[in-house]
């Protein structure tokens, strides 16, 4: 991991088309601005972790697995 120090209004360039700028510093918070092409996806890591956990919970739920098994059995009956 590369660690850089930046002051307010200073930027970091990543590649040819991504610019990260320190917009504001206050207390424990730092506001950053990200200028990137629309095809570059930018997500907050805590949101990705929450979605990942919800997906794991949904898949591990017995009722979901039972529902899927019923759907598969129903499809097999229709095909025979």
Curated annotation (Swiss-Prot):
Subunit annotation: Homodimer; the beta-strands of each monomer intercalate to form a hydrophobic core, while the alpha-helices form wings that extend away from the core.
Family membership: Belongs to the CsrA/RsmA family.
Protein name, per record: Translational regulator CsrA
The keyword DNA repair appears for this protein: no
Chain's role: A translational regulator that binds mRNA to regulate translation initiation and/or mRNA stability. Usually binds in the 5'-UTR at or near the Shine-Dalgarno sequence preventing ribosome-binding, thus repressing translation. Its main target seems to be the major flagellin gene, while its function is anatagonized by FliW.
Record localization: Cytoplasm
GO molecular function ontology, one term from the record: mRNA 5'-UTR binding
Cellular component annotations (GO), alphabetically ordered: cytosol
Keyword field contains Repressor: yes
Example GO BP: negative regulation of translational initiation
Gene3D superfamilies named in the record: Translational regulator CsrA
Keywords, ordered alphabetically: Bacterial flagellum biogenesis, Cytoplasm, Repressor, RNA-binding, Translation regulation
The encoding gene: csrA
């Amino acid at each position: 991991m590369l660690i850089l120090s930046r002051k307010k209004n200073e930027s970091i360039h990543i590649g040819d088309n991504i610019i990260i700028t320190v917009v504001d510093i206050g207390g424990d918070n730092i506001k950053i601005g990200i200028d990137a092409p629309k095809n570059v996806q930018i997500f907050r890591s805590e949101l990705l972790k929450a979605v990942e956990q919800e997906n794991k919970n949904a898949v591990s739920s017995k009722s979901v697995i039972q529902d899927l098994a019923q759907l598969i059995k129903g499809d097999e009956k229709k095909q025979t």
